[in-house]
């Protein structure tokens, strides 16, 4: 019996697969019989490194043409069209037949008197109503859905950003091209012309719950296409246009469209606004995720961190791919870094100068970022599936001669993906804030000045103190935004739409989170560049101090009063050890001050040598104690001048020692910030404020200018961690 049952089951499955393949072929769908639930496709999409995927996104973003066929649209293509950065849209001619077939089916069905939702019936909870005036019904649909508020003439702006509207238009075209919606191809061509001529309908910012799709905002696109008097659009230069002017400027030669049965529903009953904005958000989120990995590596460099936190074995044993990749990227940046080499010498020389292990914000950054990158990557794939989905209702199945009433308009993938992405962004922001807080705190930053102040007089330079307060503000708001949107669903439309995704609301909040994380990333990178320059200044100042102490020691401690060699000559080596070990910025504003550690410890070296000088101390010719005053007086005469000379040379670009960053893999980002954006070391002596420099970088980041230098930092990475050896 079991064998017979198995055979019957196998035959039934084969019959089912055969039916699916036949039906798929009839509708130009791609279905894999071996993967009917699509898990295999989803898993396949996650193969390869995240960085390679980001590189592909950037490459796609920069292509001049986006060809729509309904199944291959990517978030980077949506972001490119949304930005209107020169890319144009082309429709696949091969889709025309399928689109026409579904449109014809609707008309034939209506002519036969077939009862169909939204064609001969009312909508939602009032779908029990009936009408034979299909065109009038679509017109009324658009009228009652024009329920948005724009707040024209008020200080607040309640219009959806142009980029989000353009993204929605592109995604909606892509959905309708698949031929399941019952709309004319000519309408899709008209929307394409609006996009290519940079004519953007005005959509309300609020008013959708993204189930049944984004009804209210999408109705304003339909309103423009049908020439409603309240429809407005922005032209290429931002000028306000009515529907007639928009058509003329876009080169749409047809009259306003008289919607046929189902066409109004096809235009509005979809998730395009939420998923379109989500696509823009995720393009930025993926870039920011890679940036956070590189910033963490630069943080390790300037903090004199121990690079073993990136060792592949540690992360291999944890198994999480996001963590393994984050560690490998940081390892690549740190491998061969001059900062890491110097830090190693420092740790060997005096292992007690800092904690044995770096603090969590540095040491566990791969473990922290890894899961967040996985979340962002999974959300990206989820939204890419959504923008290539058919997400309206009912669906026209021409091959089976029926309309399917379902709920693909439910935008749960958008709401959930955006909530998850926002949580990931908030966690990235928390890490950057923790790293920033260590960087500006002289108790934790291994010798950098408090607040990263770079002036000669620290009492009149508070560096990044204001920026730290701003970072706390940014981080707090970002943490607040991490709260989920999808837990705040309200039953709508006479309890017909009793569960709904809130997809667009979640996308909007995630866009806010992106902007705040860009503010944080900009501020942090400016601070890191300040720290890089301070390490350069520190090295030159220390070199000057060391040379001067050596010179003074040779002059005052080598020879006695009668020309004989003096026992104090053996102090020089220990004096130079003091210079090596003492943090430069703890004394450099007044290097010979008796209240500062350098002068105190130099004196202590001489005292210690005197104490072991024994009987020789009783002889004025061999006494080390009697040399202390001579040494200190000579040092006071010479050292301040040499320090000032070294600082002046640094400021004039004539440093004795070159900046270590020049030979590091993180250099492209530093070069971008300093040379391309024209920023420089901030000091209290200069008028320019931290906010001005951060603003330059934030603007450049929003314009995508940081992408190339960021990827250049990782240009030599082969996609694998260093071998365990």
Curated annotation (Swiss-Prot):
Its EC number is 4.3.1.24. It catalyses: L-phenylalanine = (E)-cinnamate + NH4(+). The keyword Hydrolase does not apply. It comes from the Eukaryota. (E)-cinnamate binds at residues 269, 357, 363, 393, 465, 493, 496. GO terms for molecular function: phenylalanine ammonia-lyase activity. Contains an active site 4-methylidene-imidazol-5-one (MIO), which is formed autocatalytically by cyclization and dehydration of residues Ala-Ser-Gly. Transmembrane segments: none annotated. PROSITE patterns: PAL_HISTIDASE. Keywords: Cytoplasm, Lyase, Phenylalanine catabolism, Phenylpropanoid metabolism. It is an enzyme of class 4 (lyase). It holds the Pfam family Lyase_aromatic. The active site is at residue 117. The keyword Manganese does not apply. Belongs to the PAL/histidase family. This is a key enzyme of plant metabolism catalyzing the first reaction in the biosynthesis from L-phenylalanine of a wide variety of natural products based on the phenylpropane skeleton. Homotetramer. This is Phenylalanine ammonia-lyase. It comes from Trifolium subterraneum (Subterranean clover). The gene is PAL1.
């Amino acid at each position: 019996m079991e064998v017979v049952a198995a055979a019957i089951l196998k035959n039934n499955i084969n019959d089912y697969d055969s039916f699916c393949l036949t039906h798929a072929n009839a509708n130009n769908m791609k279905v894999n019989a071996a993967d009917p639930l699509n898990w295999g496709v989803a898993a396949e999409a996650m193969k390869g490194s995240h960085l390679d995927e980001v590189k592909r996104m950037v490459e796609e973003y920069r292509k001049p043409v986006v060809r729509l066929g309904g199944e291959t649209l990517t978030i980077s293509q949506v972001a490119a069209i949304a930005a209107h950065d020169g890319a144009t849209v082309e429709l696949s001619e091969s889709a025309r037949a399928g689109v026409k077939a579904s449109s014809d089916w609707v008309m034939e069905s209506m002519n036969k008197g077939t009862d169909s939702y939204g064609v001969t019936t009312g909508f939602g909870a009032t779908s029990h109503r009936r009408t034979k005036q299909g065109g009038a019904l679509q017109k009324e649909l658009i009228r009652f859905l024009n329920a948005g508020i724009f707040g024209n003439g008020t200080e607040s702006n309640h219009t959806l950003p142009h980029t989000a509207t353009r993204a929605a238009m592109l995604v909606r075209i892509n959905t309708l091209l698949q031929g399941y919606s019952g709309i004319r191809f000519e309408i899709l061509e008209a929307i394409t012309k609006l996009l290519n001529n940079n004519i953007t309908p005005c959509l309300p910012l609020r008013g959708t719950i993204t189930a049944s799709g984004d009804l209210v905002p999408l109705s304003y696109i339909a309103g423009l296409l049908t020439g409603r008097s309240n429809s407005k659009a922005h032209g290429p230069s931002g000028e306000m246009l009515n529907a007639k002017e928009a058509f003329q400027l876009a080169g749409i030669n047809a009259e306003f469209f008289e919607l046929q049965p189902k066409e109004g529903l096809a235009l509005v009953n979809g998730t395009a606004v939420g998923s379109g904005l989500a696509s823009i958000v995720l393009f930025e989120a993926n870039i920011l995720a890679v940036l956070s990995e590189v910033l963490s590596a630069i943080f390790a460099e300037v903090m004199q961190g121990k690079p073993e936190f990136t060792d592949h074995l540690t992360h291999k044993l944890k198994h999480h791919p996001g963590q393994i990749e984050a560690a490998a990227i940081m390892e690549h940046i740190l491998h061969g870094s001059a900062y890491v080499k110097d830090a190693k010498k420092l740790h060997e020389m005096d292992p007690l100068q800092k904690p044995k292990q770096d603090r969590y914000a540095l040491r566990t950054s791969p473990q922290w970022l890894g899961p967040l990158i996985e979340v962002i990557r999974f959300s990206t794939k989820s939204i890419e599936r959504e923008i290539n989905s058919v997400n309206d209702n009912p669906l026209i199945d021409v091959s089976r001669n029926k309309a399917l009433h379902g709920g693909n308009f439910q935008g749960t993938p958008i709401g959930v993906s955006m909530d998850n992405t926002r949580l990931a962004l908030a966690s990235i922001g928390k890490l950057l804030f923790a790293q920033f807080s260590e960087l500006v705190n002289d108790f934790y930053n291994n010798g950098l000045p408090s607040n990263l102040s770079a002036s000669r007089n620290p009492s009149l330079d508070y560096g990044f103190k204001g920026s730290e307060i701003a970072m706390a503000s940014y981080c707090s708001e970002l943490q607040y935004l991490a709260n989920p949107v999808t837990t705040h669903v309200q039953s709508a439309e006479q309890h017909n739409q009793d569960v709904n995704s809130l997809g667009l609301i979640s996308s909007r909040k995630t866009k806010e989170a992106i902007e705040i994380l860009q503010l944080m990333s900009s501020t942090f990178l400016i601070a890191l560049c300040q720290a890089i320059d301070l390490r350069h200044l520190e090295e030159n100042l220390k070199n000057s101090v060391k040379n001067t102490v050596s010179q003074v020691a040779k002059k005052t401690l080598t020879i006695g009063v009668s020309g004989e060699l003096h026992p104090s000559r053996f102090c020089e080596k220990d004096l130079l050890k003091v210079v090596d070990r003492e943090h430069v910025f703890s004394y450099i504003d007044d290097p010979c001050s008796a209240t500062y550690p350098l002068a105190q410890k130099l004196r202590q070296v001489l005292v210690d040598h005197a104490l072991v000088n024994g009987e020789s101390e009783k002889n004025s010719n061999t006494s080390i104690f009697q040399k202390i005053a001579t040494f200190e007086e000579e040092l006071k005469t010479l050292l301040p001048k040499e320090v000032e000379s070294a600082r002046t040379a640094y400021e004039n670009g004539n440093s004795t020692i070159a900046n270590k960053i020049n030979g590091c893999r993180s250099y492209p980002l530093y070069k971008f910030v300093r040379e391309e954006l024209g920023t420089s070391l901030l000091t209290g002596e200069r008028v320019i404020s931290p906010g001005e420099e951060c603003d330059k970088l934030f603007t450049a980041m929003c314009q995508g200018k940081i992408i190339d230098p960021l990827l250049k930092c990782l240009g030599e990475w082969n996609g694998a961690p260093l071998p365990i050896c």
